[in-house]
Regions:
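Extended polybasic, low-complexity segments that bind anionic RNA or targeting/receptor surfaces
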Residues: 1-46, 91-207
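A short, flexible low-complexity segment enriched in Lys/Arg and Gly/Pro that occurs
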Residues: 31-68
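Glycine/serine-rich anion-binding loops at beta->alpha junctions
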Residues: 54-90
């Protein structure tokens, strides 16, 4: 049975909670996690790179010099790749790098990432993450109080503008929501801070 402590935003211990074995207690599958992280990064690529081939560079229609008799190497165009201002050989063009992975793999990877964090004791559960107003200093003090140092992923059950604004200017801090949590963000973080409502949502969806 997996259990972890529950804290309030001041860092005070207020109880403990049981974690679902199906989500936080499986044997992590590192190969699937690797595949899903690669997929996430590929899907994030803009793919807008572009350069001109010799056919697309303007000019170069006239032969620079006659074919024979000059003693120089034969040339057909000043826009050939070996010329300054010439086209690019195999010039990169805009392309879509995204690809899909099956749902089973994505779910297994997420549970593997969460289980790995649980095994490292890197999950911090908060009773409720709530900010009355956007206050970066107050939010930073909260993270410090609960021991969330370094790269931290804060997960709430629903979007909260005050929480997002409070955390977005803290280096290494990322705020996300339980329904859009992804493997890359979990793997990239040193600590995972989530409130009880977010934990319930994750367990309901993935258990």
């Amino acid at each position: 049975m997996l259990k972890t402590n529950v804290y309030d935003m001041s860092g005070k211990l207020v109880g403990e909670i049981e974690l679902s074995e199906a989500v936080f207690g499986i044997e992590p599958n590192q190969a699937v996690v690797h595949d899903v992280v690669k997929n996430h990064l590929a899907n994030c690529r803009q793919g807008t790179q572009s350069a001109l081939t010799r056919a697309e560079v303007s000019g170069g229609g006239r032969k620079p010099w006659r074919q024979k008799g000059t003693g120089r190497a034969r040339q057909g165009s000043t826009r050939a790749p070996q010329w300054t201002h010439g086209g690019i050989v195999f010039a990169p063009k805009p392309r879509d790098y995204s690809y899909t992975l099956n749902k089973k793999s994505r779910r297994l990877a997420l549970k593997s990432a969460l289980s790995a964090k649980a095994a490292e004791a890197a999950i911090i559960v908060i009773d409720e993450i709530k900010m009355e107003a956007p206050k970066t200093a107050k939010f930073a003090a909260f993270l410090n109080a609960v021991g969330a140092t370094g790269k931290t992923l804060v997960v709430t059950a629903t979007p909260d503008a005050n929480v997002v604004k409070s955390g977005r200017n803290i280096p290494g801090c990322e705020v996300t929501f339980a329904n859009v949590i992804n493997v890359y963000d979990i793997v990239n973080a040193s600590k995972l801070v989530l409130d009880k409502a977010a934990l319930a949502t994750i367990e309901e969806v993935f258990a």
